[in-house]
A protein has these predicted regions:
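A Zn2+-metalloprotease active-site environment signal
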Residues: 2-273
């Protein structure tokens, strides 16, 4: 904990409560340690995480996915990966997309290139443009290291100690032990907006109709009752606000048809109508 914060806390407590010098020093020290644990360490871990090699990110993501024990549909996974490959996205990451046959309405990205899509979400989709929007959004979480940064911030001091001593094996073990928590991680509004707008730009560059990006989330929100909220909606707040700025950014677009993407999507919908 920075010395100036502890000293500041010491002076504040002395003035407020008139405690003895030793008592104030102990309180200031404890307070400083708590502030450091909850604020400084998570922030530092997130910054250091930005320099983790991509090969180590892959190890991390693979370990978390293995710990989740999700069984992927090989045919569906191959089709999803072929769909993403057809977007011709240039990236240093090897993107691997797994389709899990589960009613959960969700998708999430893991460090190093792993993206997981549940069939419950695929069944809600009406067009290839919606799938393109979803995968573009999740890809940005990988490309911008949102998943890695959020994991480091969530695990705080445990991750920081591993990073400090260069113990990647320890980091992988810690992350795998928190796999279920990691699957449910929510990103900050700033990171979600970055994924929205950067993912949207991928669609615009390929002249894929981007309006369906906002429509998908709006429709999911409207279709579900208050008792059954899709996980992808509950973990992505401010859906109406996001739909509005996505539609604004996509205004004036002149999309073209993409028969290859449409064909792959049709094959997926035959598996999961």
């Amino acid at each position: 904990m920075p010395l100036f914060l502890s000293l500041g806390l010491y002076m504040y407590m002395k003035k407020l409560f008139g405690l003895s010098r030793n008592a104030l020093l102990i309180l200031a020290l404890v307070g400083g340690l708590l502030l450091g644990y909850f604020f400084v360490l998570p922030f530092t871990a997130e910054q250091v995480a930005s320099v983790i090699p991509r090969s180590s990110e892959k190890l991390l993501g693979d370990a978390v996915y293995a710990a989740l024990q999700e069984e992927g549909d090989s045919n569906g996974s191959a089709l999803l990966t072929a769909f993403f490959d057809s977007l011709n996205v240039v990236t240093p990451y090897s993107i691997r997309i797994t389709l899990v046959d589960d009613k959960t309405v969700n998708a999430f990205a893991l460090p190093g290139g792993q993206i997981v899509v549940y069939s419950g979400l695929l069944k809600k989709m009406k067009s290839y443009t919606e799938l393109a929007a979803l995968l573009s959004h999740e890809f940005i979480h990988v490309e911008k290291r949102h998943a890695t940064r959020s994991i480091c911030r969530s695990l705080g001091s445990q991750f920081f100690v591993g990073l400090l001593f260069g113990n990647m094996g320890s980091l992988v073990s810690v992350a795998a032990g928190h796999a279920n928590e990691i699957r449910s991680l929510s990103y900050s509004r700033q990171l979600e907006k970055e994924a929205d707008l950067s993912g949207l730009q991928l669609l615009l560059d390929r002249r894929i109709d981007a309006r369906d990006f906002a429509d998908l989330f709006t429709r999911l929100k409207e279709q579900e009752s208050d008792l059954v909220i899709p996980e992808i909606i509950s973990s992505h707040p401010d859906t109406d606000v996001r739909a509005a700025y996505i539609k604004k950014a996509a205004a004036g677009q002149q999309p073209v048809s993409h028969p290859v993407l449409n064909h792959i999507f049709d094959q997926l919908k035959k598996l999961y109508p």
